[in-house]
A protein has these predicted regions:
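Residue-level signal for inorganic ion chemistry
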Residues: 20, 97, 381, 439, ...
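Hydrophobic alpha-helical transmembrane segments in multi-pass membrane proteins
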Residues: 12, 20, 197, 257-455, ...
Length: 820
C-alpha cells in the first residue's frame, strides 16, 4: 500500500514534468542559457520555500517540476544542434569526414549522414567551421534526365564508417511548410543535423576520394552489410516482400515500396512492417523467457549463482539488455527508444519489488522518454505507443484482478487444454479490439484515416509477423536461407492484405478534426473500454459527433480562397469556393519514389476531405505535373484540364479531360474562372511541337471585386500576347516561371498592377529563382512579394485581400529555419 500511495503522489509531479516539456516546445525562439538557468534556480527556490504540508506542498513541488523540466528542455535544445553560418551557404567547400549512418539508395544516387572532421573553402583554402553532422546527397552528373540528373553516371557505393574527401555545397536545414504537414526540419533537428547539401560532381570538380575504412560507427557498418546481403539474396524475388524483410531486420523503412505502405496503412498494420515497439517488446519477452529457462536449468547443473539470483529477475535484466542491442542494431529509432525506456522502467520496478498501476508505469516511462528526447512529444508514434501500451497494461491488470490465472471453470464437455487455448484466443481478440478502439481517435487526428478492417487484419498479421516472419528474418542474418523462408512467409500475408485493402469501406477517410474534438473522441473511446456503467458508454457516443462530422470551413458564397502550397521548386495552388475546388498544377517530382503529390498534396486534400472538381495542369514540365498521378489516383472523379500533348500518359489516368484554351470560362458559387492562354487555333493546335512553357494554361479568377491570375511558366512572348489582347488589373499574381528573368516583363506588370506577387520556388534552388532583377521590378512598382521559402504555404482570401497567412509564421518554433 505504501508503494501504491507513493506512486500516486509521484504521478502529479510526473504530469507537471511532462507539461513543462510541452510548454518549452511551444517557444518560437530559444532563450539564452542564463535565462534557462534562472528558471531552474527559481524551481529550486520554490522547493526550498515549500515547507508547509498538504496541498500547498504538493502544488509547489509540481510547479518546481514544471519549471525545472522547462529549463532542462531548453538547455537540451541549446546543445542539440548548431546550424551552418548563412555566409557559407551556397559556397563550394572541401570536406573531410566519415559516413555516419547507413546510406539510403535512391534512383538518382545516395543520401547519407556525414560527420565532418575538417572543412575548407575551395576558392581561398582557408579553414571554416561547419556543423559536425550534415546530410548529403550524392547524385549523378547534371543536366541529362527530366529530373536534372544523369542516371547513367550514378556515384559509386558509399559505406558507413568510410572516410571521404569530397566537395559539397551546403545550406541550412530547410523543409516544406504546409498546414499539418510533415515537419522535415523537426526531423533534422532530432537527428542533430545542422546542414544539408549535395556533393559537387562533373568535369569542373574533382571526384570524391575515398580515404579508407575506419572503425567508427561499427553498428551502422554492420547494419549496411546485413542489408546489402539480404537485398542480394532476396533480389530475385518479389521486390516489395524483400524490402519488408530488410526493414524488419535493419529498420530501413525506405526499403519498402510505397504501394505496400499504402496497403499497410489501409489495413492498419503499418506498425508491424518496420522496427516498432511491438517487435522490441516481443524480442525482449522471448529473450527473457529463454534466459530464465536456461538460468533454472543451470541450477540443476550445479551453478550456485542460480540459487542466489531469482530466474525471473535475471531473465528480465537479460531481456532488457538484449532488447537494447536489438534496438541499437535497428538504427535506434524513436519508436524503439521509447520501448526500451518503458521496458527499463518496468524492469526496475520489478527488481525493486514495487507494484505500480499501469497508468503510473506509463507516466514514469513518458517522463523518462521526454527527458532524453523532448521532441518525441510531437511525433504521432509517441502518442500511439503510450496509449496502446497503457490500455493493454490496464486491461491486463483489470482482467488479472477479476479472473485468476488458470484453467479453472472449464465446462465438463470441454477439455482443460482446449478451454485454456480458447481463453487465450478470446483474450487476444479482446485486447486487439480494445487497442483498435482506443487508437481510432488518434489515427483520425494524426492521419485522417481509420482502418475498418484493421482489427481483422491485425488478428492475422500480429502473430504471423511477430512469431513467424520476424524470427525467421532475424535468424536469416546468420543463415541466409531462413531469410528466404521469411520472404515466402510474407507473400501470402501481403496477398491477403492487398485483398482486404480493396474491400469497399476498408478504411474511412475523414477530415482531420481540431485537437479538442479529437480529445473528446479519445475520452469516448476510453470510456468504451473502461469498466463503467453501460449508460455512461451510450452517453459517451455524443462525444464522437464533433470529430466524426467536423468539416473544414469554406469560403462564403461569392468569395474564394487560394492556398499556395509549399512544394519546393514547382507550382501547386488549391483554389476553393463555397462548394467547389480546383487544383492548379501538382508540384514537382523529387525522385522515382517521391513527388509532391504523395508528400504534400494527397495529405493536404485528405485532411480537409477535399473533393476536387478540376485538376488544371498548366503544361507538361515535371515541376508542374510531378504529383498529378497521385492526385488523379486519389481523386478519380476530377476533370483534367491541360495543354499536355495527346499521347501523354496522364490523359489515360483521368476519367474525364479537356484541353485548356483561351475563351473557356465558368462560374462557381458566384466566382468566375476564365482561361486566358493558350489560344489553340491554327498553328498552335499541335501542342507536341511547341515549347512547353509557351503553352502554359493561364487562369484568371474573380469574384467581381477582387481577382487573381495564375500564370504558369509563360515567358516574355506569351506575356506580350496577353497584353495585346487586354489584361485587367489583379490583386494577386502567381509570378510566372517562378520569377525567372525570362518572364515578368515591365509591360505585363504594368497591365496587371498586382498588389501581391506570390513566388513558388525552392530554397536556394539551382536555377536562382526568383531572379534579383525580377524582384527589383516588382518592388519598384510597390508590389508586395512573398515567396514560399520565407512564407511556407500561403493562404489568401478574396474577402480579405490585404492579408496573407504564412504557414511558416503561424507554426514557427525554435527549430524552424528563418531564411535571411
Amino acid at each position: 500500500m505504501h508503494t501504491l500511495r507513493w506512486a500516486r503522489g509521484l504521478s502529479p509531479v510526473l504530469l507537471a514534468w511532462c507539461a513543462g516539456v510541452a510548454v518549452q516546445l511551444q517557444q518560437t525562439a530559444l532563450w539564452p542559457a542564463a535565462a534557462y538557468g534562472a528558471v531552474a534556480g527559481l524551481a529550486l527556490v520554490i522547493l526550498g520555500w515549500s515547507r508547509a504540508a498538504g496541498l500547498h506542498r504538493h502544488m509547489s513541488i509540481c510547479t518546481a517540476a514544471l519549471l525545472l523540466s522547462f529549463a532542462c528542455t531548453g538547455g537540451h535544445a541549446l546543445l542539440q544542434v548548431r546550424v551552418i553560418d548563412p555566409a557559407l551557404e551556397g559556397q563550394d567547400l572541401e570536406l573531410v569526414g566519415v559516413v555516419q549512418a547507413m546510406p539510403q539508395r535512391q534512383d538518382i544516387g545516395w543520401r547519407f549522414r556525414f560527420e565532418v572532421e575538417t572543412a575548407h573553402r575551395v576558392d581561398g583554402g582557408q579553414a571554416v567551421t561547419v556543423p559536425r553532422k550534415v546530410y548529403l546527397g550524392w547524385y549523378g552528373q547534371d543536366g541529362v534526365s527530366d529530373s536534372g540528373w544523369n542516371l547513367s553516371a550514378l556515384p559509386e557505393p558509399v559505406q558507413a564508417g568510410e572516410r571521404w574527401r569530397l566537395r559539397a555545397r551546403l545550406k541550412a536545414p530547410h523543409g516544406n511548410m504546409n498546414p499539418r504537414g510533415f515537419d522535415y526540419e523537426l526531423w533534422l533537428w532530432e537527428q542533430g543535423i545542422g546542414a544539408t547539401g549535395t556533393v559537387r560532381t562533373g568535369a569542373a570538380h574533382p571526384p570524391p576520394l575515398r580515404l579508407g575504412q575506419t572503425w567508427m560507427h561499427p553498428v551502422e557498418w554492420w547494419r549496411q552489410s546485413v542489408r546489402d546481403r539480404l537485398q542480394n539474396r532476396l533480389g530475385t524475388g518479389d521486390a516489395g516482400v524483400a524490402g519488408i524483410v530488410v526493414a524488419l531486420v535493419t529498420g530501413d523503412q525506405a526499403a519498402i515500396d510505397r504501394s505496400h505502405w499504402d496497403v499497410f496503412r489501409a489495413t492498419g498494420v503499418a506498425h508491424l512492417m518496420s522496427i516498432s515497439g511491438l517487435h522490441v517488446t516481443m524480442f525482449a519477452w522471448l529473450a527473457a523467457v529463454s534466459v530464465a529457462w536456461g538460468w533454472r536449468q543451470s541450477a540443476l547443473w550445479g551453478f550456485k549463482g542460480a540459487l542466489r539470483w531469482p530466474a525471473p529477475q535475471v531473465g528480465a535484466v537479460a531481456g532488457l539488455g538484449l532488447a537494447v542491442l536489438y534496438a541499437v542494431f535497428s538504427g535506434w529509432g524513436v519508436p524503439a527508444q521509447r520501448t526500451v525506456w518503458m521496458l527499463g522502467v518496468v524492469v526496475l520496478l520489478r527488481l525493486s519489488a514495487r507494484q505500480w498501476a499501469a497508468g503510473h508505469v506509463c507516466l514514469l516511462a513518458a517522463a523518462v522518454v521526454l527527458t532524453l528526447d523532448p521532441w518525441a512529444l510531437l511525433q504521432p508514434g509517441f502518442w500511439l505507443s503510450f496509449v496502446a501500451v497503457a490500455v493493454l497494461l490496464w486491461t491486463d491488470q483489470r482482467r488479472s484482478g477479476m479472473h485468476p490465472v488458470g484453467a479453472s471453470g472449464a465446462p465438463a464437455w470441454c477439455p482443460v487444454w482446449m478451454y485454456s487455448w480458447l481463453r487465450r484466443g478470446w483474450g487476444l481478440l479482446r485486447e486487439q479490439s480494445v487497442v483498435t478502439l482506443a487508437l481510432a481517435p488518434l489515427c483520425l487526428l494524426f492521419f485522417g484515416q481509420v482502418s475498418v478492417v484493421g482489427l481483422l487484419a491485425n488478428l492475422v498479421a500480429i502473430p504471423w509477423v511477430s512469431f513467424v516472419v520476424t524470427p525467421l528474418a532475424m535468424l536469416g542474418v546468420l543463415w541466409p536461407g531462413l531469410a528466404v523462408l521469411a520472404a515466402w512467409a510474407l507473400q501470402p500475408l501481403t496477398v491477403l492484405l492487398v485483398w482486404m485493402a480493396a474491400w469497399p469501406g476498408a478504411s474511412v477517410q475523414l477530415a482531420l478534426p481540431p485537437w479538442g474534438f479529437a480529445a473528446l473522441a479519445l475520452c469516448a473511446a476510453l470510456l468504451w473500454v473502461s469498466a463503467v456503467p453501460r449508460a455512461w458508454k451510450v452517453a459517451s457516443l455524443s462525444l464522437l459527433w464533433p470529430a466524426l462530422f467536423w468539416t473544414a470551413p469554406r469560403p462564403a458564397m461569392g468569395t474564394y480562397e487560394l492556398l499556395i502550397t509549399d512544394v519546393g521548386q514547382g507550382n501547386a495552388v488549391l483554389v476553393r469556393t463555397a462548394k467547389h475546388s480546383l487544383l492548379y498544377d501538382a508540384g514537382p517530382r523529387y525522385s522515382a519514389e517521391s513527388d509532391a503529390g504523395h508528400r504534400v498534396l494527397v495529405p493536404l486534400l485528405a485532411q480537409t476531405a477535399e473533393k476536387l472538381d478540376v485538376l488544371m495542369l498548366s503544361h507538361r514540365d515535371s515541376d508542374h505535373t510531378g504529383g498529378a498521378a497521385a492526385v488523379l489516383a486519389m481523386q478519380p472523379q476530377v476533370l483534367l484540364s491541360s495543354s499536355l500533348e495527346s499521347e501523354h500518359l496522364l490523359w489515360g489516368m483521368a476519367s474525364s479531360s479537356t484541353l485548356c484554351s483561351r475563351g473557356q470560362s465558368w462560374v462557381w458559387d458566384g466566382v468566375r474562372f476564365e482561361v486566358l492562354h493558350p489560344a489553340l487555333d491554327g498553328s498552335e493546335s499541335s501542342v507536341s511541337t511547341r515549347k512547353p512553357n509557351s503553352l502554359s494554361c493561364v487562369l484568371r479568377i474573380s469574384d467581381g471585386v477582387h481577382s487573381a491570375l495564375l500564370a504558369g511558366d509563360i515567358e516574355a512572348p506569351q506575356e506580350q500576347a496577353l497584353v495585346a489582347v487586354g489584361l485587367e488589373p489583379v490583386d494577386l499574381l502567381l509570378v510566372p516561371h517562378h520569377g525567372s528573368k525570362t518572364s515578368s516583363t515591365p509591360e505585363f506588370l504594368a497591365a496587371l498592377q498586382p498588389r501581391l506577387a506570390l513566388v513558388q520556388a525552392g530554397y536556394r534552388n539551382r536555377f536562382g529563382h526568383p531572379a534579383p532583377a525580377v524582384l527589383a521590378r516588382y518592388e519598384a512598382m510597390g508590389t508586395r512579394v512573398i515567396d514560399s521559402p520565407h512564407c511556407g504555404a500561403a493562404t489568401w482570401r478574396s474577402d480579405a485581400p490585404e492579408q496573407v497567412l504564412c504557414e511558416r509564421e503561424r507554426s514557427l518554433r525554435y527549430w524552424h529555419h528563418r531564411p535571411p
